[in-house]
Amino acid sequence: MSHRFPAGSILFLVRPPYGDRYSYVMRPLRYSINVTLDGCCDHRAMFADEDLFRHVVENLEQADALLFGRVTYEMMEAAWRPPARPGTRPDWMEPFARTIDAAKKYVVSSTLERVDWNAELVRGDLGKAVQQLKRESGKGLLVGGVKLPLALAELGLIDEYEFVVQPRLAGHGPTLFAGLSKHVDLKLVSRLEFGSGAVAMRYEPRR
């Protein structure tokens, strides 16, 4: 049985750090998103099963912290912060729920006055703030959502992109990276197929 789930759910594997426009080695910033065959990234158009969630948990366990914008943070908090109402999700979602609940989170927002749920606000210049987070030691930062990754891609700060292509046609948007001002050339580094027909494709920028 498949279930819908927020698009901000993270599906990352550890990759070696790569240089970015700031030109020195830092812990890598990775982005993962679910997308339909016709390019829709609305989480309501997605579905997930136990195999995909197992992949999500394995990847989350290799993360130091999550990076969200306000909308994704609020969506994920509403979906996954305890306590869950009994019977609202299957047992195989519980490892993901526990892992994301415990994770350190950074929230980029100029409007929120405070956050909790193991979270810390990130304000000011986005490039400098994320650069500082990347300088810290660790395994990597994971970013989810749609709008924040667009800004990070513009700054050349994303070190890995993972697109989990769902075997579905949605017939509507939103789409990824709408308004991106320049091409970002990528090279495929891995491909993983799931029994559902979904395919996780991981790319690194061509530097």
PLM segments and residue spans:
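Enzymes that bind and transform nitrogen-containing heteroaromatic metabolites
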Residues: 18-207
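N-terminal amphipathic/basic-hydrophobic helices that include classical n-h-c signal peptides
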Residues: 1-25
